[in-house]
Amino acid sequence: MTRPTLADLVAAQERLAGIARVTPVLSSGTIAGFVGRAVLLKAENLQLTGSFKIRGAYNTIAQLTDSERQAGVVTASAGNHGQAVAWAARQAGIAATIFVPEGAPMTKVDAARGYGATVTLGGEGFDEAVAAARLHVETTGATFVHAFDDPRVIAGQGTMGLELAEQLPPGPGTVVIPVGGGGLASGIAIGLRALRPELSLVGVQAAACAPFAGRAPVGPTIADGIAVKYPAELTSAILRDLLDEVVVVDDEAISQALVLLLERSKLVVEGAGAAPVAALLQGLVPGSDPVCAVLAGGNIDATTLVSVTRFGLTSSGRYLVVAIMIPDRPGQLARIVDAVAAQRANVLSVTHHREGRNIGVLETEAELTLETRDEEHSQALIAALAAEGFAVRRLT
């Protein structure tokens, strides 16, 4: 398979003109304050269909022959790529079939259907969905649009690199790119190495699935958009040649970055989109030159957003859950609440447990969920409760 060239990226940019948005690069004073350098955010979460995937999908579909267009397109995806293929196929007036694994997020399934695609369950996992899509190709002659292992897809994603070459300030700097299958990072790297060779390029992967960092997959991650176990030979070769480094962040760091972007930058991003910011906050991208984090997508459903936000607040010490054993008589809970109020913390919920192996007949265990400013505030609150004579057991 031939590696895309700068000319391929320029041709893709011409095809995407008036189709894909030229997403903005935003300055973040808040994140800059944390990392001690100028921070820019490539807000691709504001792209059509909510992610960069529309670039590669449309560039591929726009190059189909008449006979290929008549047979339609097919892909396997549980998320952003499926939506992008569905949208691009609708724009081209051709049929699209998306095979999804069981348990795929319903918001993303519904979005693909809303763009006019036929969505079909393709088995328990992603591999089964791919197998079903390949079988569909054999029986119908449809064109399989791969999420990353296709030069046309890589060239389309690379149009973001052409935009960054113009949008970033002159001189040295660093671009941090989420890496899953490697299509986005490969495309950006091809463009920036040709046009802005002075820039450093850093890839970031989720700790649970980081093959480019030499780690075996160990389980699910909130950054499902970059949870690719087996990258392609083409993208692997490109990234080995063109990336300066690949760093790894865990779900705790990703969730904290997601919350920060939501609260301070007013940007809704998915886990994969928050990974570059997580790498910055964790100090994994040292330097003093300006740094740009690519926010690759913003497709996160409300239920997941609530869960990830709560996880991020808890991991940063802003949600504190404690259990306190108290005598089962009036006024004891009020003492706890008064101590919490004196520390300027907020009580979110209280649960009483009167049954349990370690709970005496005349005792009750009060479990409190508290809102605090940060980890330091949480520790000060626990110390204040202990000073009031309470035996505090921290649960988060």
Can you name each region flagged by the protein language model?
Residues M1-T396:
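PLP-dependent amino-acid enzyme catalytic core
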